[in-house]
């Protein structure tokens, strides 16, 4: 029987970290065996590559030293000849002969030794570079079959093998989105003004989740600066009583603040659960877990107690675990009874352990927003990670490096995603309550949602859809229409801005007692829209878990050949 996870930190340390390592190693070994990589031949080739690169670095260093010597000798020779010519009537003949002879010897040494050595070293470097390039091409050929076996779902399959009750969808379907709306009260207003860069949907303990990264434009402000230098003269009397003219200058500076489109990207975990259906709160990282003796902890504790005594603050009442209340701080919650049912003593204990640990996990680095049945976790540690899971990142010409990178990359992603779920796993009720659809069966409609369409458009890139005059990033929005042949035509609209140069004159008072117009160049932004289309086809064939990676690739090839499309990404073939 699969056990629930009530202490995600300890489960990661004692179970999942090592289990994922084993799964990743077994997955890579299976891929390598399937690809029939000649490991020894590749190891020999790579050793030759690295030796060649080291030799090239040594030759480059020697070339640098000989070039320095060459420059010094030529400068010395030229100076010597110049001295002999210019000072021929001033210096004794012996000195002139000594200087001239030294210059001649320098030139002879340059022509006989230095330049031939440089030529030889450059030739050796070029030959070695060609040899290394040929060896690298050979290494890529040796690894070609393995590099072809990586796919977009390799990490999610490994995660599902590692963590019980964690399932990933092939792609974010309309049914999954409809379930979030109907069962959990999801509101599509979240997507207004946002474009989905990527999304991974699925179930954990039978409840739906979406890991997504979005781009949003907000009109901010930018300050532009200009300056003007003014000059004037005054008449002054010096200490001797004489009148004189004094010149003055001053640089006047001015600024113009104008609207400026700013773009923000954010990665979130959105999770639906019917537990505590009326509860609303949001919390931000406090950094106070484990700092009970600090002045800030005591101050926050004082204010929370004061708020709890204030009847005007509604339903807020502190739990007996004051350390948890201060560190987790959800004093803006609207329903204390449901909060207490959700955050039991066991949940509080697990959450505090999670907040304190910065070694295995990430500590207190997440926002936790609950809006009735929708929970949103925004972890800081995922903001700099690209969780699109592009398989190109695994490709390498060196088998040993590929093996090392495969584990390290996936272990980093697994840790980041696992600890995004961890705040939810701390709550026992979230694992004890599942939707009726999960209990009594699932009838998943395999049509991709607009989230997936926007992610696909962003995968193809803004450049394909942006307006020719656009000078900013774009927010890509889509609309879809199913075609008679089963494919889908996606219309993409790229919302961006063009800019127009402006010149404003700002009056500034100068030291000469006059007002001056200081020019400031700035830009005014106007919205523009670009358009384009993507043809896509969803591969809805149920995947056999026993299928080999070669069989998966053959299936992908069949889909691309059948649909005449270019790219297969996460069970969707497409062409832009």
Language model region names:
Residues 243-245, 256-576:
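Membrane-proximal, solvent-exposed terminal domains/tails of membrane-associated proteins
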Residues 133-276:
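Soluble extramembrane domains of integral membrane proteins
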Residues 1-65, 132-165:
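Basic, amphipathic N-terminal segments
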Residues 114-152, 308-329:
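Intrinsically disordered, low-complexity acidic Ser/Thr-rich regulatory segments
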Residues 70, 89-95, 148, 182, ...:
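Acidic, low-complexity intrinsically disordered regions
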Residues 60-136:
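Transmembrane alpha-helical hairpins and terminal membrane-anchor modules
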Residues 11-14, 18-21, 25-28, 32-35, ...:
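Alpha-helical context
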């Amino acid at each position: 029987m699969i056990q629930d996870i009530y202490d995600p930190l300890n489960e990661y340390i004692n179970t999942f970290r090592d289990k994922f390592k084993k799964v990743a190693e077994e997955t890579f070994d299976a891929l390598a065996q399937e690809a029939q990589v000649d490991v020894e031949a590749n190891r020999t080739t790579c050793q030759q590559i690295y030796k060649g690169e080291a030799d090239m670095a040594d030759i480059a260093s020697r070339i640098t030293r000989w070039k320095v010597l060459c420059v010094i000798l030529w400068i010395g020779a030229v100076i010597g000849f110049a001295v002999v010519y210019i000072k021929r009537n001033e210096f004794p003949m012996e000195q002139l002969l000594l200087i001239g002879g030294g210059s001649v010897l320098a030139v002879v040494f340059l022509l006989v030794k230095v330049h031939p050595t440089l030529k030889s070293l450059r030739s050796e470097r070029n030959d070695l570079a060609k040899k290394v390039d040929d060896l690298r091409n050979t290494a890529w050929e040796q690894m070609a079959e393995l590099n072809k076996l990586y796919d977009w779902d390799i990490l999610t399959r490994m995660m599902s093998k590692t963590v019980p009750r964690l399932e990933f969808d092939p792609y974010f379907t309309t049914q999954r989105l409809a379930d979030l709306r109907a069962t959990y009260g999801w509101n599509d207003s979240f997507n207004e003004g946002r474009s989905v860069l990527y999304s991974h949907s699925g179930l954990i303990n039978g409840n739906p989740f979406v890991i997504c990264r979005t781009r949003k434009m907000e009109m901010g402000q930018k300050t532009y600066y200009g300056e003007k230098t003014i000059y004037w003269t005054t008449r002054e009397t010096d200490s001797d009583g004489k009148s004189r003219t004094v010149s003055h200058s001053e640089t006047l500076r001015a600024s113009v603040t104008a609207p400026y489109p700013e773009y923000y990207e954010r990665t979130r975990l959105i999770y639906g659960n019917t537990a505590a259906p009326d509860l609303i709160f949001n919390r931000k990282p406090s950094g106070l877990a484990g700092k009970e003796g600090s002045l800030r902890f005591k101050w926050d504790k004082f204010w929370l107690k004061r708020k709890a005594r204030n009847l005007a603050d509604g339903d807020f009442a502190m739990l007996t675990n004051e350390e948890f209340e201060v560190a987790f701080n959800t004093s803006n919650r609207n329903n204390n009874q449901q909060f207490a049912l959700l955050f039991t003593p066991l949940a509080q204990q697990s959450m505090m352990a999670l907040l304190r640990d910065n070694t295995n996990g990430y500590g207190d680095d997440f926002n936790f927003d609950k809006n009735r049945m929708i929970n949103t976790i925004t972890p800081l540690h995922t903001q700099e990670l690209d969780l699109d899971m592009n398989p190109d990142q695994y490709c390498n010409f060196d088998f040993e490096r590929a093996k090392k990178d495969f584990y390290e990359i996936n272990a980093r992603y697994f840790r980041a995603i696992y600890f995004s779920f961890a705040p939810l796993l701390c709550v026992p009720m979230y694992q004890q309550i599942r939707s009726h659809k999960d209990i009594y069966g699932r009838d998943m409609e395999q049509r991709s949602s607009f989230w997936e369409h926007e992610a696909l458009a962003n995968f193809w890139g803004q450049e394909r859809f942006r307006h020719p005059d656009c000078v900013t990033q774009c927010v890509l929005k889509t609309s879809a229409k199913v075609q008679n042949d089963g494919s889908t035509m996606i219309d993409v609209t790229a919302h961006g801005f063009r800019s127009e140069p402006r010149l404003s004159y700002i009056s500034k008072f100068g030291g000469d007692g006059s007002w001056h117009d200081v020019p400031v160049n700035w830009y005014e932004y106007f919205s523009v829209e670009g358009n384009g289309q993507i043809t896509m086809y969803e591969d809805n064939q149920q995947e056999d878990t026993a299928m080999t990676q070669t069989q998966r690739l053959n299936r992908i090839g069949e889909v691309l050949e059948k649909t005449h499309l270019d790219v297969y990404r996460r069970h969707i073939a497409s062409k832009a």
